[in-house]
Amino acid sequence: MKDLLLYIARNLVDDPDAVSVTEHEGDQELTLELRVAPDDMGKVIGRQGRIAKEIRTLIRSQAQRTGTKVSVDIVD
């Protein structure tokens, strides 16, 4: 999941070297924290959060194939 999120985020932003993803495993859920450069935050979130919603949808659909529950947090 982490690699997929990195791939998606790096292709959306102007500064792909500033993209990082941190994994946090909970009891029943894996949380991925996405960090990007402040100037690229709008590109990852999108108008009215549409891009962020689609990123979360893609990651969740991939996680369902492996039977995992995943949430994506975009951290500034």
Regions found by a protein language model. Give the residues of each.
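RNA-contacting regions in translation and RNA-metabolism proteins
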Residues: M1-K43, I51-D76
